[in-house]
Amino acid sequence: MTLVAQKKPAFGLPGRIQAPNSKPRSIAVVGLGSGGAAVARELSRERQPNVEIHVLAKSAAGSDAVAAIQAGGGDLQRDLMNADMIFVVARKGDDASLAPVVGRIAHSRNHPVTALYVVPPEAPLTDAEDETLRALRSTAEMLVVVSDESYVPAMIATLAS
């Protein structure tokens, strides 16, 4: 076998998980803003195996994104580098200014980011795109809009199993 053939991903696409579906997935969930942080904290209470939770409730004031991430505790970069799947979660109106930082770490490892955007059904709909949605769209390859945050733990549990 040539060196070129050895470097080609087993399943064809770079960044795709290179293991059979029977292997449990490692998932990193990052809660952004106060609402996303609450969803992430609730998810952490369920203590799901193979799921690392990070809370980034503070905003990235100026260029001090590193300080805001360090205030969240844990080792975000390590967990994102080791994860098979990366999710960011935020509620409508949350400060998601740290989403691009999470995205840069994930993309440095060729990992896609999925954004979970919680918009309650009673939230007023407007034609204008809000700042939270704009930040999530700029970071994520896939955006999932949900009206009920109880969907988030169920989805993560299914994907991690």
Language-model region placement:
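Short glycine/serine/threonine-rich phosphate/pyrophosphate-binding segments
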Residues: 36-40, 94-101
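A charged, well-structured terminal subsegment
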Residues: 142-161
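Short, glycine-rich nucleotide/cofactor-binding loops
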Residues: 85-97
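A short helix->loop->beta-strand "cap" motif at the edges of active sites that frequently abuts
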Residues: 106-113
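Short N-terminal or domain-adjacent regulatory/targeting segments
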Residues: 1-25, 69-70
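Glycine-rich oxoanion-binding loops at beta->alpha junctions
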Residues: 56-85, 147-151
